[in-house]
């Protein structure tokens, strides 16, 4: 199975933070935090999967898939990491300390007032909580993440210097920037499709 995701990253008080979402209580396969993604649907590009899944799993808090694409373009582009057939699209986002609170409160309200079968069968409400994690928290709180995602966290930690360089460059420009596999990450100004 090929899958793709988005992962917002920011700098706050000089520290890097990644925004992750926690699977809802009905998830049986692997509980815990991860990024915002899922499997590529038939005929869909990897990058469009990332936009769609990101907008769905964030319940529109960053907008629909077109809005997510525009946000990423506005912020300067992506840094892409791949692990097996899982493609992570990291992008810079301005820090918003209230975003996790608003998302979680909204989820809790809807979760308590809607039919659980409807929620379980929906593409929405997959995440019950979102949270900013610092680099240090990624090292010390791996146990809070989905089991398959721990290897991906190790990949982030191994590549943190280049991710930091990417974030700093994307804050000021929209240049193409190489990823950890010596391929080029493309901004959406320079690339169509996925």
Question: Could you tell me what each predicted segment is?
Answer:
Residues 1-35:
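N-terminal strand-loop-strand
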Residues 2, 17, 85-91, 129-131:
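Short beta-strand micro-motifs in enzyme catalytic cores
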Residues 8-10, 20, 90-94, 131-134:
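Short, well-ordered beta-strand micro-motif
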Residues 12-13, 27, 80-83, 123-125:
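Extracellular/periplasmic catalytic domains that process cell-envelope and extracellular macromolecules
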Residues 27-32, 88, 98-194:
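Nudix hydrolase/Nudix homology domain
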Residues 35-75, 89:
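The catalytic Nudix box helix
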Residues 63-115:
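Acidic, glycine-rich loop-and-strand cores that form catalytic or ligand-binding grooves
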């Amino acid at each position: 199975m090929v899958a793709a995701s988005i992962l917002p990253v920011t700098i706050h008080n000089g520290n890097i933070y990644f925004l992750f979402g926690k699977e809802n209580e009905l998830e049986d396969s692997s509980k815990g935090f991860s990024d915002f993604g899922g499997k590529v649907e038939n005929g869909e590009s990897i990058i469009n999967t990332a936009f769609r899944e990101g907008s769905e799993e964030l319940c529109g808090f960053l907008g629909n898939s077109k809005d997510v694409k525009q946000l990423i373009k506005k912020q300067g582009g992506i840094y892409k990491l791949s692990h097996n057939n899982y493609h992570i699209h990291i992008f810079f986002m301005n820090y918003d300390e209230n975003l996790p609170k608003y998302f979680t409160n909204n989820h809790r309200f809807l979760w308590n007032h809607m039919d659980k079968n409807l929620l379980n069968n929906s593409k929405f409400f997959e995440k019950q909580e979102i949270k900013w994690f610092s680099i240090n928290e990624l090292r010390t709180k791996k146990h809070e993440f989905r089991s398959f995602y721990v290897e991906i966290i190790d990949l982030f930690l191994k590549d943190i210097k280049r991710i930091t360089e990417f974030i700093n460059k994307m804050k000021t420009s929209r240049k193409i920037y190489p990823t950890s596999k010596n391929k080029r990450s493309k901004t959406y100004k320079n690339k169509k499709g996925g």
